[in-house]
């Protein structure tokens, strides 16, 4: 995924989030938020499974974002997940994803990807949960976000240096990333919006089956 494509992907997703095309639903597990959005391109079959499970099969898509997590994010949350199936053919991310306000920040912790590994302005590295992540920032100007369709905001990224193996239980200790970001002057906002473990794709095909807790 080229950088301009990723920016389009993020902006388009955020625009539709701002008009509530994402739905939240209670589940039996600790998750309480179900995210399911597509721009209508291609075929995206998403299933909100029991507890923290979801699955998605996609073919020749435009942009889509599917995931499960929490209505209110937290800098102290430890996210556990098992991607029993993670098989993108083209552009896609397996990522912790969310937003804060005051200030408005969009953040990613990317554990795996398809054909494109995201980058930005390099800030350093952080070691967490058995891997090393590169830290990047990017800035969006007059772009869609959860607060409207013409906003300026910063994106924070932790991107694993190598794709994380899937098929077994995995952990993202989010506080490690928050603290590392803070050490580089990358402060998150004080008002936490949703936080999900997402499958995100753009102009690709594939399948995933993820359980989050």
From Swiss-Prot:
Family, similarity comment: Belongs to the glycosyl hydrolase 11 (cellulase G) family.
InterPro entries assigned: ConA-like_dom_sf (IPR013320), GH11/12 (IPR013319), GH11_AS_1 (IPR018208), GH11_AS_2 (IPR033119), GH11_dom (IPR033123), Glyco_hydro_11 (IPR001137)
Pfam families noted in UniProt: Glyco_hydro_11
EC number annotated for this UniProt entry: 3.2.1.8
PROSITE patterns in the record: GH11_1, GH11_2, GH11_3
Result after altering residue 106 to S: Drastically reduced activity
SUPFAM superfamilies xref list: Concanavalin A-like lectins/glucanases
Main EC class the enzyme belongs to: hydrolase
Catalysed conversion reaction: Endohydrolysis of (1->4)-beta-D-xylosidic linkages in xylans
Source organism of the structure: Bacillus subtilis (strain 168)
Protein name (record): Endo-1,4-beta-xylanase A
Gene, per the UniProt record: xynA
One example of a Gene Ontology biological process annotation: xylan catabolic process
Signal peptide range in chain numbering: 1-28
Protein's pathway: Glycan degradation; xylan degradation
């Amino acid at each position: 995924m080229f950088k301009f494509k990723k920016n389009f992907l993020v902006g388009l997703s955020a625009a539709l989030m701002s008009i509530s095309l994402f739905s939240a639903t209670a589940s039996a597990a600790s998750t309480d938020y179900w995210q399911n959005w597509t721009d209508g391109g291609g075929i995206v079959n998403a299933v909100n499974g029991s507890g923290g499970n979801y699955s998605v099969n996609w073919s020749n898509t435009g942009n889509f974002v599917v995931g499960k997590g929490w209505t209110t994010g937290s800098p102290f949350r430890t996210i556990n997940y098992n991607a029993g199936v993670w098989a993108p053919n083209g552009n896609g991310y397996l990522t912790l994803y969310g937003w804060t306000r005051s200030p408005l920040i969009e953040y990613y912790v990317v554990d795996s990807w398809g054909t494109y590994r995201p980058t930005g302005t390099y800030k350093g590295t952080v070691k967490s949960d058995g891997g090393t992540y590169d830290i990047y920032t990017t800035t969006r100007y007059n772009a869609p976000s959860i607060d409207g369709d013409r906003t300026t905001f910063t994106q924070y990224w932790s991107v694993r240096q190598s794709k994380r193996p899937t098929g077994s239980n995995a952990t993202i200790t989010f506080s490690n990333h928050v603290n590392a970001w803070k050490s580089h002057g990358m402060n998150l906002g004080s008002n936490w919006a949703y936080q999900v473990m997402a499958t995100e794709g753009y102009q690709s095909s594939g399948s995933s089956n993820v359980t989050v807790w």
